[in-house]
């Protein structure tokens, strides 16, 4: 009965916040507070749905996706090869940051704690940065607890073992060296450099920051075409470090522009500039942003790959829009007012579309957003609600709220 009551309350909150957002869409202007209220209501719906009949919860099971024709989260066990496990704790930490609700903080702590063992396990791949910084990174940022700091430092040391000095980048997928025919570095890996920079600033080996910068430099040199669009995967000779080729894994083709890959580039180089204050990275962040913005459809939410020949019938990828919106709200803070205004306006247009009835789940699902694409070539998570879309959506809203 209690679970049913909580679902009813959460549902009423969703209705109220969606009504507010709809009014804003019709002329009142985007309001990040209404969007955050909506996220909070959806978080509470998810928490209710995760509880068993006795009110208990398995904190090792994380929301991953809600497929197109489904209405509830599919859960995944927290394991070292489940790269999305940190995003749900991260969503809870951002919701706690917004609401100040101690019950949300307690749930965030419990889900975060279930990931601790990953910092002490043999490294699986580059995704350890996603797993730890979204969960423990936000936990430490909001609480300052020493135990969280130690987990991040340990994980950073583990991630650093993937760095290959002869190549100059981290090896993204050790298990796929043979498949790609060499040392593989994927664009997603740019996000994981943040953990190396963080550790270097918080008592870890200063060389971790040098390692991250070297990776960013090598990626900047070889991972992009002349127009600053990115390959998904850069393949290097394992022995000599020579760049061999750029290919795709999750995009449409080797020479196409996979939307989320470019989103990782925008977010990653913005972060690298924050950590280094090296103007080369600020300039490059703008270049990779501009090629993305120039190719967006009218609603500012990209198709999953900008070069899919089935456009406009190709699926959209809301997750890419969320990553970019969050990145742009940081990037604009480093730029002169005229350029900053351009990027800030683009981010708000993205968030406005994402908050509309076209993309927001509303009462139909407890996720924030619909219409993301995970891995289309593999037929996986196409036109789905995906947890990392929700993570970067709420992060972008928090950044906008703190900006205004």
List the predicted regions and their residue ranges.
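Bacterial Sec-dependent N-terminal signal peptides
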Residues: 1-27
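Glycan-recognition and catalytic cores of secretory/periplasmic carbohydrate-active enzymes
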Residues: 22-404
